[in-house]
Amino acid sequence: MRLGSAALDSAIALTVWLQIELAEPWQPWLFDIRSRLGNIMRADAIDEPLAAQSIVGLNEDELHRLSHQPLRYLDHDHLVPEASHGRDAALLNLLRTKVRETETLAAQVFITRSFEVLRPDILQALNRLSSTVYVMMILSVAKHPLTVAQIQQRLGEKP
């Protein structure tokens, strides 16, 4: 079974558009997201395992922690998008929802009726990409957004 390229192609297209629309601070994030989406497409197309890949130096576990505990790590609580969050957050939310749609489609394709997960690597990668874009949204609305180096330092601190 294959996910096919339509959903991934659409997510890549939106990522490329945001690379044009958004300012420099987001470029490394978007470059890595675009790369990850392309690697997912390739792994799906040729049925090979998907290798681990960081986004701006953050691994999948770190991205998961950031998205689930933003107040602890990013100094901003969870958010529900609204117009007052501004243009960057709105554009990033379009990408987040596109990645989530792709993840949902992947779940339909790669989880059998007996609940066997055929491509856990692709499902987890898509889930972490939506987490990544959610983290970007939070950083875009924070009064004093943290740098990646500051985020990495906080992730390394003991609770």
Please annotate each region the language model reported:
Residues 1-159:
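Phosphate/pyrophosphate-binding loop motifs in nucleotide- or prenyl diphosphate-using proteins
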